[in-house]
């Protein structure tokens, strides 16, 4: 669906923040995908929860704007998002794409950090 409209140039279509797609990246996005949760993105949700991304599970929320200092959360509690080596396990441990993908999107991990879905394997 996305490749054809991008090729035709009639509409600007792009594959959203739903995981790394390997060789298809250039066909469906303008840049390589890498989850930016906690790197360049942070979210404050309606209830005040501070999350590295609005799409991440609630057990990954790192604080609350009504109780915690946002800068402290950004600088200290988001550290696991910035060093993704902990994600290099299971299928990711031997994947040739890990250096680009960095373990896929945080919203695709369970509460123990296990990958629930690898978009690359689905292709």
Report residues per predicted region.
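A C-terminal junction/extension of Radical SAM enzymes
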Residues: 1-58, 98-100
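Flexible mid-to-C-terminal extensions adjoining Fe-S/redox cofactors in radical SAM and related proteins
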Residues: 55-123
